[in-house]
Amino acid sequence: MGKEDDRGEEYLFKIVLIGDSAVGKSNLLSRFSRDEFDTNSKATIGVEFQTQLVEIEGKEVKAQIWDTAGQERFRAVTSAYYRGAFGALIVYDITRGDTFESVKRWLQELNTHCDTAVAQMLVGNKCDLEDIRAVSVEEGKALAEEEGLFFMETSALDATNVDKAFEIVIREIFNNVSRKLLNSDAYKAELSVNRVSLVNNQDGSESSWRNPSCCSR
């Protein structure tokens, strides 16, 4: 206490993980937030979230990442789950084609319930299971380009691209918010009410993060 905060901004961004059951959403979250992988992970019941600190351009950003059950019987939480989200990772399992086919339905639900523009990343998880792959990298990339999403394949098991996927979404949110705050007091007020506390209006944008077809493995 008593220490003067010279950073000027304080950010808290809500990010949601969506996708069918058993695609690895919970393990992606635990790998990113705690660097852990649970081989006996059970289906999520209801909603869970973790908060992770990330530093961007000298500013402390708190990402509040929400994980929810993918089963249809839990869809009653939909509106509250999406409300106030700044970003979303839409996750499918590269070994299960049906989870990839569900992506457009998840995108429709996301766009229906979110109350603001959302930074979106399509994530093909379990890329360590190359021998039983059912969805090609090219298919994932093509869908991401069609829908205007970032794209990345990940493995929660061996941590491939997990940090990178989350960090791209967080940085994209940061850049979007910074640009809008530069010229909009109304937007600043909206964010303060919804889910972000901001003190100053400084632009921290980096256009190099805005590749809508980012794909790495």
From Swiss-Prot:
Keyword Nucleotide-binding recorded: yes
Pfam families: Ras
Compartments it resides in: Cell membrane
Domain of life: Eukaryota
InterPro entries recorded: P-loop_NTPase (IPR027417), Rab_GTPases_membrane_traffic (IPR050209), Small_GTP-bd (IPR005225), Small_GTPase (IPR001806)
Keywords: Cell membrane, GTP-binding, Lipoprotein, Membrane, Nucleotide-binding, Prenylation, Protein transport, Transport
A Gene Ontology BP annotation from the UniProt entry: protein transport
Keyword Kinase tagged: no
Binding site for GTP: 19-26, 67-71, 125-128, 155-156
GO cellular component, as recorded: cytosol; plasma membrane
A GO molecular-function annotation: GTPase activity
Identification of the protein by name: Ras-related protein RABA5b
Annotated organism of origin: Arabidopsis thaliana (Mouse-ear cress)
Gene: RABA5B
